[in-house]
Amino acid sequence: MTPESRDTTDLSPRGTQEMEGIVVVKVEEEDEEDHFQKQRNKVESSPQVLSRSTTMNERALLSSYLVAYRVAKEKMAHTAAEKIILPACMDMVRTIFDDKSADKLRTIPLSDNTISRRICTIAKHLEAMLITRLQSGIDFAIQLDESTDIASCPTLLVYVRYVWQDDFVEDLLCCLNLNSHITGLDLFTELENCIVGQYKLNWKHCKGISSDGAANMTGKHSRLTEKLLEATHNNALWNHCFIHREALVSKEISPSLMDVLKKAVKIVNFIKGSSLNSRLLEILCSEIGVNHTHLLFHTEVRWLSQGKVLSRVYELRNEIYIFLIEKQSHLANIFENDIWVTKLAYLSDIFGILNELNLKIQGKNNDIFQYLEHILGFQKTLLFWQARLKSNRPSYYMFPTLLQHIEENIINEDCLKEIKLEILLHLTSLSQTFNYYFPEEKFESLKENIWMKDPFAFQNPASIIKLNLEPEEENELLQLSSSFTLKNYYKTLSLSAFWIKIKDEFPLLSRKSISLLLPFTTTYLCELGFSILTRLKTKKRNRLNSAPDMRVALSSCVPDWKELMNRQAHPSH
């Protein structure tokens, strides 16, 4: 076909189809151009491209930024760049290439003060990227928690979750170093000054707040959560951290079982409290040939420590008994009590099971439906176990350590009855406490919107009527559940990514789903952040201003190195 024939307009139906085809191709080409332009911008701002198109001084500056970025990401001391990284790089370059190439690395500024300034610059850059996104008017949710660092300085961490491009993004919003003896109202003032005053964000876009149930967050005198909800005009949903609630449930224990736990901890403290005792037990365990040779400490602030401590004490019970006899300790008498050892076996099982549940509700980017399934499933499991023990033929298969202990040891019927009653009382108490901390009425809205979890489960049109949706929403769900293409997307994408992907085609259902999935259900990210803080701020670095390092170490944004270099090349006057 000649160019002239392609330009000729055909008014026939066939020609109309060809014209429509041309328009479609043009739109696709525009989309492709936009896609490739984004990829080009991304490549142009990458360190690899920048290093090829700049002078030696600019390359040295970029290298300084890249090293500082890695130092912060790895939570290293700022002196590591000059004392470890640079000498190591020079050794490698000198070995593989020559001295002249290695000497070029000396032009890279890597002193501790320089690295500190670079990290501060990168942190401000990442903060600006995040705030620019949030200032666009998108909805967001926050989780917050407060703790103290090695220097006894209160620190407030706030994480944010928001919709960006094709999924939820979670990022550190702010790390605030606070004054001592700060109250809940003071915390709110600090947050208000930062989020509204400094970042210019509007609380009306905050759709979710998550915190633990500590007094400084929810106490009647602190009123932090209450003030935050007032600031959002009560449009935000407050979630008490699921992990914290589950940890509170595990603390409900009868006096008899608490006595077993306390004695186990006392034995551990007797051995671990002395380095000599620890070494002697290690030697004894090594000679006997057991898998583990050390006991573990228990601490109240570590959620998973109880189960691990009890399991290790039970596993090494014979070795500990021999050791205590050799030390002529009265604690050896504890292991001669069969009922105590049997209860120890049960506690190691039940706390191990609670630990597994705790781990299931940890992690990033988990939706509230997943948490609800884990909690409701465990509540049903507790009821089933109670029914199993009350039956004419009770079984202990759900507690493998206890079952093995009963099978391997001769335990009289009276002891078994006492232990069975103790277990039943504990399981009943756990069920009641779960119902208190996870009341069913709190999850009614989730059950009413169960279609969000799987919109393709309603193949029968009549089943959609029972969902109490608006007519427009019913029509969208009817069309959505009939799409095989979108069903394939549903299978491959996360739940949040799926609803974001179809927001233009099904706006009502998508908006409703995103608003329910957006709020945090735990403060896991804050706990993870405090763990990072303990690595950054040590006894030797107790005067460190941790906020910039925390920002770079935890940020989900990737620095735009091209923008950073341009800013450095054109400083403000």
UniProtKB/Swiss-Prot annotation:
Location of the region described as Disordered in the Swiss-Prot/TrEMBL record: 1-51
Any one GO cellular component localisation term in the record: membrane
Subcellular location: Membrane
Principal location: membrane
Regions of this protein lying in the Extracellular compartment: 1-513
Alphabetized UniProt keyword annotations: Membrane, Transmembrane, Transmembrane helix
Protein family (similarity comment): Belongs to the FAM200 family.
Name recorded for this polypeptide: Protein FAM200A
Gene that this sequence comes from: FAM200A
